[in-house]
Amino acid sequence: MILNVGLGERAYDIVIERGCLAKAGALCNLDRKVLVVTDSGVPLEYARTVADQCAEAHLVVVAQGEQSKSLEVFGDLLQTMVEAQFTRGDCVVAVGGGIVGDLAGFVAASYMRGVDFYNIPTTVLAQVDSSIGGKTAINLGGYKNMVGAFYQPKKVLIDLDVLRTLPRRQIANGLAEAVKMALTSDTQLFGLFEKAAATGGFTAGAGMGTEAEAADATDAGTGAGADATGAANTLDGTADDATNPDASNAASRTDAVYAALEPHLETIIERSLRVKKHVVEQDECEAGLRKILNFGHTIGHGVESYEQALYGEQNAGTSASASNAAFAAPAFTATDGREQGLYHGECVALGMIPLCAAPVRERLIPVLRALGLPTTRAFDASAVTQAIKHDKKSSQSGVTIITDPEIGMYTIEQTTAEALGDMLPLIQEKEA
């Protein structure tokens, strides 16, 4: 399957095909010098598969985790290109998750004012969200994505076969972003998650429309948008009511949920990409509509910054040894190497909850719990509020946020970091 992101001269294809990693040389122009960037948490064979298809590959493995989105690593990659005498006719390829894509994309955007960039995402989060849209960035001063550029890839290759090496927690981390898309823009996709959460399984296609219906829904206008004073409109399609999972059977029900979701992963990725594709085509540089993709991210980034300061970079991702141990394991294995700290998608899951209307929140929380995502967390509310003030969505006039009044709907509003801080008790663990 090929989806085209229609951006005029910057248009590009998203290739969704099992096994396309081995076809990278045929699908991308790699007959030149290529900087292949991956990280220590990605099975090295993925990057080597790409490198073997290049005329001249320079493979660099950075440390896994947010610490690699730094000025130092950014400079090291640029220096590698200088020393290898890369020209503007050469290119950069990212093979990894969102961190690798952000870093490598910004390197491509910066070297000689821009060289070709190809993105090959290897995590669910990157496949459903961060690999398309052109956002590239590194962190600065302890805050996420403070330095970056909008720089579109030449092509994105999505190979679902690479997901077989991911532990379940990494799958859940990515599915949080798919739930985000569903909440604001795709009631049928939310219905898929809700049915799985309620029953632990469903028949093929239950709660989902056809591929054509997915395209129609997206083309009709992603989600149901409104500004703070406007009325919202709904997409076609409805989601069924959820049944709260029995806490005593939470582990076994989570197993059932993932067993049910796994055959539908391609559908989840496709529908999420259709939502984001439509948004990016309408608002490439986040002047308006694209802000809906930040749903859950303002509070989520605040929690994430707090977590990184609290636990340190040793917990910024799974260890290389844990990743290698998971390499031969089946998809949806139960554990990974992180013992403390939250992943980005887990923080987004928390960040969505306070910004949903109460009836939406009542339906969202069972879905998040069924996926194994957090719905509460212990944190210092004042520290999280302070981090929100440094979020890139903050300005002198306040903080732009997305709220969810109803499934498949959204509003864009202005508020303050202090007002968001007042919402934090909804996700803050109560002291014993």
Where are these regions (language model features)?
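ATP/NTP phosphate-donor binding region
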Residues: 1-91
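C-terminal charged capping/lid subdomain of soluble metabolic enzymes
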Residues: 11, 176-179, 361-432
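A glycine/threonine-rich phosphate-anchoring loop and its flanking beta-alpha core
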Residues: 15, 29, 106-203, 406
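Residue-level signal for inorganic ion chemistry
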Residues: 17, 36, 70, 121, ...
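Non-catalytic interfacial helical region
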Residues: 78-95, 104-119
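Short glycine/serine/threonine-rich phosphate/pyrophosphate-binding segments
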Residues: 99-106, 127-128, 301-302
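Active-site segments that bind and position negatively charged phosphate/pyrophosphate groups
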Residues: 200-205, 252-383
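Small-residue-biased low-complexity repeat regions
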Residues: 205-233, 241-242, 246-249, 319-321
